Every structure is written in C-alpha cells, then in structure tokens.
C-alpha cells in the first residue's frame, strides 16, 4: 500500500482579505449572520464583489511531493503562496509549516529559511556586486561561519548548473536573463530549504530556457526537495506534478492527480483554463470514438 504521507505544510480554513480591516471583517461576519445565513455561506458564496482574496482554503503539502497550483490571475494563487512561509499571516484559520504555527512571529521567522520562495522574475531582486555576494546574502544573514557560507554558495550554484569559478566574480548583470534567474534560484537554495515554492518560475523565458528550467526543477525534486509550483501552463503541470490544486476566486476549485483534474475539461474551461495538449488529443480521439 502507499505510505502515509507526512504533511510539511497545512492550511486549515484560511481566509485573507487585502481590503478589510479587522473591524470590517467582524462586521461582514455579523451582517451575514443577521441575514440568516451562516457567515461561512455568505462569505464563500460566489460573490464577485467579495473582498476576500482567499476564502476558506484548506490544503496540505506532503513531504517529497511535487504539487502544482493552477488558476487565473486573481484566483488567489499568489496570496496563497505568500501564506506558505509566513510572508502573509492568515486572518482566519491557521497555517502550520514543518510543525510550527505561522501565526506565531518567532515560529514564522524560523520557517522562512526552511520554506524557500522564488517569486516571479526573481532576477529583478538581484542587487549585489558579484554573483558570489548575491548567493551568500541569505546564509550570511543566518549568521553561519564563513567556510559554511562558501560551501553553500559553491554547492547551490552547482545545483543550478553554474560554475563558481566561472561566474562567481562576475556582476549578475553581465549574465544572460536565464543565468540571472539561476543565480536567484541559487540564492534561495543556499538557505538549504526543505520546501521550494516557485511562483511562475518559467515566466518570460524562451522555449529552450523553459525546458532547461523545468529539467532543473524536476532534478531538485528528485534530489529530495518538496516542490510547490504555481503555473498557468497546464502542460508544465501535467509533466511535472504528482498532484494539482486548481484555484478559482480565492477558493480551491479542484484537486487531484493530473489525470483526475484534467478529466474535467469542461469545468476547467468554464473558469478559463485549458487542458494539456496530450489530454486534448485524448479527448478528441475519445469523442471521435477512436
């Protein structure tokens, strides 16, 4: 049978609003209760004017899995990603990561190194004079001894396919866009996280660089990292992920293996998402009775 998977990150009934103050949130609940609905129903009804970016989201990330997050801009994926390592704390519900409660400030700080987040276009956050300094920034901040920092810089550059002796002393801005992104990845890997969270990691790359990056991410996963990847490319998700969670209007719309999720082509189409090319082909053949 399958081994029981160990949860590394758990979200339980998480809701988050960018626009409502705590007082307004209480009023919103009260108003719904007065309207004779349970507050949950009123909150999570498909109200397009809803000020909630996340609505009652429950989700578990298991150790060692490759989890895909899909959904349109505005579906809540990016807000969700920022909850995974305490960058945003939930206003309702709770998040536990690596056994720690992220509503606790001290615990949230401890988790930041262990759950590494690579945001969209991460090369825009490069700032140091040399590649080495940029990658060393995180480990230095952890207060590690210099020889350990050096070891991590070399090993994380090599994990993203860059050679310290070739690029270490260069300015990150002398490198190609794809290489700059690798340097940004290395900076997160140098923290030696247990979970790697990637928000649209292939955004803006040409097809060849995309393929290289997917291979890189796949290799990091095979080497033992738990990976959560946000992507609007259904093909990428179908190729890499063990499990996919589809977000829509701040709530979990569907979840399952790629085959389970993509079997619901019509429902996905209704929220503006396609299915991967291979899946479309299979559907077309099935419809043609082949």
Tell what function each PLM region has.
Residues 192:
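Conserved catalytic motifs of ABC-family nucleotide-binding domains
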Residues 171-175, 179:
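Conserved ABC ATPase signature
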Residues 196-199:
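Catalytic Walker B motif of ABC-type/P-loop ATPase nucleotide-binding domains
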Residues 85:
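Helix-to-loop junction immediately C-terminal to a conserved catalytic motif
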Residues 70-72:
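The feature captures the beta-strand-to-loop junction immediately N-terminal to the Walker
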Residues 93-103, 111:
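Conserved ABC transporter NBD signature motif
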